[in-house]
């Protein structure tokens, strides 16, 4: 897929262009007081940060994970600070933050967010969010996990199957199997038109056409031929040069009537439900593995899926610009990187901290993160090809 010309969205441009001198001065004063960006101190005085955080008394977080609720009691018990958490999808968080910021409304302190394409190409350049790295965890993170944003964990969208009703192993071994007639109406996933991470999953497949072509030949024993519908669709979209295997896969996949469901948990349970005869497969979050329940749900990842096991994306923590409680924000971020990681210490969620990941691999009997056959989301490619992808998706649907 031809990369679209680089541009900033109109909203992001307006965020910068319409900012008044008074607001800019106020923002710089906040940055200085909050100790972020160029005003970050050389060393972090955690006694002072904690004292100031207790004085602030509350911290508001927009969280991509509902598990943030599990930290409320323990954080308040330890620090006397109330967490006000909102479970909001990553893309909606950023839209909400942008609108509030433009309106001069500043209520959120921390964002817990997985939408790297918008974060890195809009929010961070526009200084809507600020990176903060607690010194206590810095040495356990790679440079890419510290900059441009702090990564708390690595998540993935993968394919699950019902292990109870497939005792001999996964019923498919290739992404191309999803295009076979026997799987018509039997593949579940969130709609890429409604779920940004589902769209990112598909876009990442589209960004790897050579691997998809090789996988087709391994699966069917012959070179791939393009459908007329794919050829016509490509001719109608100026940003796409020519047909490729990934586009052909998407066309055949959509023609095979996948079932779109809004809840990733519901998808997992519908796949793993043992009280059925002909279970579907499902594309959902790796960490849903924790939802297995003896005698009720039995679902497992298809580790050997060709050409990839899944698509991985980082989940980051950051301070919102003009956060009213910046010290409590710093304290919460450190907490979520340390003992407050516990709600996400589940199979399928890999901690960015090296020591914690090593413990997870041993405890959960899982492959290490680096040994998984995953394609990482390319934030720049996802961002600049988004409109091209949507045009293609609608043409092929």
Language-model-detected regions and their locations in the chain:
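Periplasmic-binding protein-like
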Residues: 139-142, 153-157, 249-253, 296-321
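Mature extracytoplasmic/periplasmic domains
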Residues: 310-378
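Conserved C-terminal helix/tail region of periplasmic/extracytoplasmic solute-binding proteins
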Residues: 27-42, 370-397
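Short, polar/charged alpha-helical segment
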Residues: 44-54, 64-82, 290
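Gram-negative bacterial Sec-dependent N-terminal signal peptides
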Residues: 1-23
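N-terminal low-complexity, Pro/Thr/Ser-rich intrinsically disordered segments
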Residues: 25-52, 230-234
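A ligand-binding cleft/hinge motif common to bilobed small-molecule-binding domains
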Residues: 117-122, 272, 277-300
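Extracytoplasmic ligand-binding site segments that recognize negatively charged/polar headgroups
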Residues: 62-73, 84-98, 106-269
């Amino acid at each position: 897929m031809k990369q679209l010309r680089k541009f900033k969205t109109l909203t992001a441009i307006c965020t910068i262009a319409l900012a008044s001198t008074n607001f800019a001065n106020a923002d710089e004063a906040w940055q200085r007081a909050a100790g972020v960006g160029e005003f970050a101190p050389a060393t972090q005085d955690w006694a002072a940060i904690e004292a100031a955080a207790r004085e602030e008394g509350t911290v508001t977080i927009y969280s991509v994970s509902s598990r943030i609720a599990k930290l409320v009691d323990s954080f308040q018990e330890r620090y006397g600070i109330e967490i006000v958490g909102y479970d909001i999808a990553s893309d909606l968080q950023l839209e909400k933050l942008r609108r509030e910021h433009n309106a001069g409304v500043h209520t959120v302190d921390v964002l817990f967010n997985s939408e790297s394409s918008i974060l890195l190409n809009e929010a961070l350049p526009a200084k809507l969010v600020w990176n903060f790295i607690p010194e206590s965890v810095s040495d356990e993170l790679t440079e890419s996990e510290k900059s441009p944003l702090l990564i708390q964990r690595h998540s993935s969208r993968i394919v699950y199957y019902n292990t109870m009703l497939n005792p001999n192993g996964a019923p498919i071994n290739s992404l191309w199997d999803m295009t076979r007639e026997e799987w018509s109406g039997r593949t579940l996933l969130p709609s890429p038109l409604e779920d940004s991470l589902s769209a990112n999953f598909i876009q990442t497949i589209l960004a790897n056409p050579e691997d998809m072509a090789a996988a087709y030949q391994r699966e069917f024993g012959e070179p791939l031929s393009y459908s007329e519908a794919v050829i016509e669709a490509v001719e109608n979209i100026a940003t796409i040069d020519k047909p490729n295997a990934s586009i052909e896969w998407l066309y055949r996949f959509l023609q095979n009537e996948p079932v779109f469901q809004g809840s990733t948990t519901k998808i997992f349970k519908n796949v793993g439900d043992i009280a059925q005869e002909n279970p579907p497969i499902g594309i959902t979050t790796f960490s849903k593995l924790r939802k297995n329940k003896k005698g009720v749900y039995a679902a497992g990842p298809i580790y050997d899926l060709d050409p990839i096991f899944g698509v991985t994306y980082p989940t980051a923590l950051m301070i919102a610009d003009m956060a009213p409680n910046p010290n409590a924000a710093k304290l919460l971020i450190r907490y979520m990187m340390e003992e407050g990681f516990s709600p996400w210490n589940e199979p399928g969620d890999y901690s960015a901290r090296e020591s914690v990941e090593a413990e997870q691999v041993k405890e959960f009997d899982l492959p290490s993160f680096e040994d998984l056959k995953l394609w990482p989301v390319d934030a720049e490619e996802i961002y600049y090809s988004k409109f091209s992808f949507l045009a293609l998706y609608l043409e092929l649907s």
